[in-house]
């Protein structure tokens, strides 16, 4: 496989094996073709909500297909996912969003933040959004993780490498 950006990996595999299973998790599976279409529509929904290239997007979802869909949709916009535990108490989640200043929080109830747009777990993009491939975009950073805050306030660890 030639080197692919994170925003193109799904497109690459969907073009070669659209009907093969991409993710199988707890009895639910999606194919590469479905994964491609769903992440394209989700990326367009996130864009409509204000996500732009090089933004941080906090993802507070449990492990599973929806988590991967959110991360790849963010990468397709040339933005940077900032995954956090879906089980974090609100006070810790607020500290992390204050630190990262994301343009969107995925996995928090709508209106959970005064100044940040959020969408709940189970968010489904509108059917009007295209499932066609998006232009290739690559963020300056691959991911933004947070430290545990064991020496005080959590810190943001931004990485350009997997």
Q: For each of these PLM feature ranges, what is it?
A:
Residues 1-4, 111, 119-142, 154-158:
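Flexible, low-complexity linker/hinge segments
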Residues 2, 11, 19-50, 55-64, ...:
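Conserved AMP-binding/adenylate-forming core of the ANL superfamily
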Residues 31-33, 139-162:
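Conserved AMP-binding A3 loop
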Residues 39, 43, 81, 161:
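Short amphipathic alpha-helical/adjacent loop interface patches that line ligand
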Residues 57, 74, 146-150:
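Conserved S/T- and glycine-rich ATP-binding loop of Class I adenylate-forming
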Residues 62-72:
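Cytochrome P450 catalytic-core helices
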Residues 72-77, 99:
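Short hydrophobic alpha-helices that are characteristic scaffold elements of the AMP-binding
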Residues 82, 86-114, 125-126:
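Conserved ATP-dependent adenylate/AMP-binding module captured primarily in the ANL superfamily
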């Amino acid at each position: 496989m030639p080197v692919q950006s994170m925003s193109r990996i799904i497109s690459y595999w969907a073009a070669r094996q659209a009907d093969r299973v991409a993710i199988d998790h707890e009895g639910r599976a999606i194919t590469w073709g479905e994964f491609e279409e769903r992440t394209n529509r989700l990326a367009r929904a996130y864009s409509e909500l204000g996500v732009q290239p090089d933004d941080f997007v906090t993802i507070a979802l449990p492990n599973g297909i929806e988590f991967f869909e959110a991360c790849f949709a963010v990468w397709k916009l040339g933005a940077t996912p900032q995954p956090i535990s879906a089980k974090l108490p609100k006070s810790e989640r607020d500290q992390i969003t204050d630190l990262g200043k994301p343009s969107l929080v995925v996995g928090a109830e709508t209106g959970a933040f005064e100044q940040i747009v959020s969408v709940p777990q189970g968010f489904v993009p509108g059917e009007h959004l295209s499932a066609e491939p998006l232009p290739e975009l690559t963020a300056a950073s691959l991911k933004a993780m947070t430290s545990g805050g064991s020496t005080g306030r959590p810190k943001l660890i931004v990485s350009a490498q997997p």
